[in-house]
A protein has these predicted regions:
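Acetyl-CoA-dependent GNAT
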Residues: 57-62, 125-127
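Short, charged/polar, Gly/Pro-enriched secondary-structure boundary elements
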Residues: 49-53, 65, 116-120
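A broad, low-specificity signal marking well-ordered, structured residues that form hydrophobic/aromatic
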Residues: 42, 53-55, 110, 120
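Flexible, active-site-proximal loop/turn residues at the rims of small-molecule/cofactor binding pockets
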Residues: 36, 79, 126
Length: 133
């Protein structure tokens, strides 16, 4: 299956989430909608990526975010200077560094939590989709 991935998450404060992910992780707004059957939303991504985020807020029946310590979005950043810069940007944008529930992520990465408790891991390593035998 060849597909584009959308990661959709309810948030408490839509604009706060947008600013945090744009400033902290370098995303840009690629779409927005208001009062679509009671939902407001913003899509964030970057040109050329095969994924994007959608943050939503329901005006009628707000959904409280309910992430767990193992609900992770992991970004693999093999370049040390890009990794360090992104970690600094995440902190400056309001992400809070937390100890990872799974110690594996603390070996080569840092785990951050946004204002809704969603976790992002910045992993200082490369990733390959090749199948291991």
């Amino acid at each position: 299956m060849q597909a584009h991935l959308r990661i959709a998450r309810p948030v408490r404060e839509l604009e706060k989430s947008v600013k945090m992910y744009c400033k902290g992780l370098g995303f840009v707004e690629i779409g927005r909608f208001a009062d679509h059957e009671g939902f407001d939303g913003v899509m964030l991504g970057r040109p050329g990526l095969s994924y994007h985020f959608e943050f939503t807020f329901c005006r009628v029946h707000p959904v409280a975010p309910a992430p767990t310590a193992e609900d992770l979005i992991v970004f693999y950043l093999p370049d040390p200077s890009e990794w360090e810069s992104t970690c600094r940007s995440a902190l400056a944008a309001g992400f809070v560094e937390v100890k990872s529930f799974n110690p594996y992520w603390d070996r080569l990465g840092r785990t951050f939590e946004d204002h809704d408790g969603y976790r992002v891991v910045l992993q200082r390593a490369a990733w390959s989709n090749s199948v291991s035998s």
